Amino acid sequence: MSGKSPAQTRVVVGMSGGVDSSVTALLLKEQGYDVIGVFMKNWDDTDENGVCTATEDYKDVAAVADQIGVPYYSVNFEKEYWDRVFEYFLAEYRAGRTPNPDVMCNKEIKFKAFLDYAMELGADYVATGHYAQVRTDENGIVHMLRGADNNKDQTYFLSQLTQEQLKKTMFPLGHLEKPEVRKIAEKAGLATAKKKDSTGICFIGEKNFKKFLGEYLPAQPGKMMTLDGIEMGNHAGLMYYTIGQRGGLGIGGQHGQLTSDPWFVVGKDLTTNTLYVGQGFHHEHLYSTSLDASDLSFTREMPETFDLHCTAKFRYRQEDTGVTIHVNGDKVTVDFDEPVRAITPGQAVVFYDGEECLGGAMIDVAYKAQKVMQYQ
């Protein structure tokens, strides 16, 4: 933290109209900071009935800001979001991968475009309602730690943040559990105290995912087969399926020769537009032993090349897995202590040393016993 008193320290809070960012602004105001609320409009989400949820969310931001006595603004990042997040999202699906737009949104919008905007408002820091913690050591290096609420910890989605970004960031909810945040909101009588949490990808909202994606990328139906070459039916388009997926295959009633286990997506082949399926949650083709990833980013300065044993997550809310990482610039090879199920190209692999989030990368390819996993 700077040497300034809270009253001299301007904190610009990203306010979404939800309870988490509302309580973030409230706590900072109560701690004496010079608080400004900013609502980010990242997507034109007017639905078929002409209702725009962003308008409703902004009304909630205004109501809370008025209640706690802080000025507030709205900023439009639709172009930045389209160029830096949505185009990436579509490109990943075109390539047959399963992207993580939340990681990219934090990297490019909330902690880049918004951070730049906040600095123009004279901010010393930005703050968001994420469940994560930052600690500064005696050398001035900022460490990002998991949120105290293990069920809500969001460091997975913040894993691409840099040291420079973290030095200008506050996470006031990091030490709290979600029920406590609700209680604070209710006790203060905030307009958003009982508002339900938003779920899903922000630009899809409550819309049907398949229908939404089909509006931007033409679906290419193809064959659904087992790895033994038995044709099981047709798929609606490879982009609609992810590795390890169970539902939505339309072959639930079909049994294999030896088992009545449910069917799962075990692979995709873009060259032949084939979706591969197999029976059983623990189908051997779902397990891999290592991966390659790129776009590696660390939350603090690290050597250009090094090896390290640490833990990793391959998806949100997953238990940590022991791994050894081999870093070479912005690329990393990750060897797993034990085989891992359903590694998904396009998703983030995020590294931890105990409670500290070290950073992350985007998964390119998975391996099994040093061989590229066929049809992933």
Curated annotation (Swiss-Prot):
Q: Which residues bind ATP?
A: 14-21, 40, 129
| GO annotation, biological process | tRNA wobble position uridine thiolation
Where is it localised? Cytoplasm
Where does the record place the catalytic residues?
105, 202
Q: Where is this region: Interaction with tRNA?
A: 152-154, 315-316
Disulfide linkage: 105-202
The Gene Ontology CC terms held by the record are: cytoplasm
Q: Which InterPro entries does this one have? A: MnmA-like, MnmA-like_C, MnmA-like_central, MnmA-like_central_sf, Rossmann-like_a/b/a_fold
GO molecular function terms noted in the UniProt entry: ATP binding; tRNA binding; tRNA-uridine 2-sulfurtransferase activity
The record, for Gene3D superfamilies, names: Adenine nucleotide alpha hydrolases-like domains, HUPs, Translation factors
Its UniProt entry gives the catalysed reaction(s) as: S-sulfanyl-L-cysteinyl-[protein] + uridine(34) in tRNA + AH2 + ATP = 2-thiouridine(34) in tRNA + L-cysteinyl-[protein] + A + AMP + diphosphate + H(+)
Keyword vocabulary terms for this entry? ATP-binding, Cytoplasm, Disulfide bond, Nucleotide-binding, RNA-binding, Transferase, tRNA processing, tRNA-binding
Sum up the protein's function in the record's words.
Catalyzes the 2-thiolation of uridine at the wobble position (U34) of tRNA, leading to the formation of s(2)U34.
Question: What is the name listed in the Swiss-Prot or TrEMBL entry for this protein?
Answer: tRNA-specific 2-thiouridylase MnmA
